[in-house]
């Protein structure tokens, strides 16, 4: 990734950064909850973004 990024690329990277976090603990504590973890979690070295 270059140091000089276009704004569109930077905005996409910011969105992916926000998506790449674990689910909050209060979501797990909800009644009748089946979500255990974030299935769409991405590791920076294993899976690359298609930008």
UniProtKB/Swiss-Prot annotation:
Gene Ontology MF terms in the entry: structural constituent of ribosome
Q: Which keywords has UniProt assigned to this entry?
A: Ribonucleoprotein, Ribosomal protein
Q: What InterPro entries does UniProt report for this protein, alphabetically?
A: Ribosomal_eL39 (IPR000077), Ribosomal_eL39_CS (IPR020083), Ribosomal_eL39_dom_sf (IPR023626)
Q: Name one GO biological process term.
A: translation
Q: Which domain of life is it from?
A: Eukaryota
* One family name in Pfam for this protein: Ribosomal_L39
Q: What's in the GO CC field?
A: cytosolic large ribosomal subunit
Q: Which Cys-Cys disulphide bridges does the record give?
A: none
* Family to which this protein belongs: Belongs to the eukaryotic ribosomal protein eL39 family.
What is the protein name given in its UniProt record? Large ribosomal subunit protein eL39
The source organism is Plutella xylostella
UniProt gene name: RpL39
């Amino acid at each position: 990734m270059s140091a000089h990024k276009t704004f569109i690329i930077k905005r996409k990277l910011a969105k992916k950064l926000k998506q790449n976090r674990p689910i909050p603990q209060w979501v797990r504590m909800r009644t009748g909850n089946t979500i255990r973890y974030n299935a769409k979690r991405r590791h920076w070295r294993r899976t690359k973004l298609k930008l």
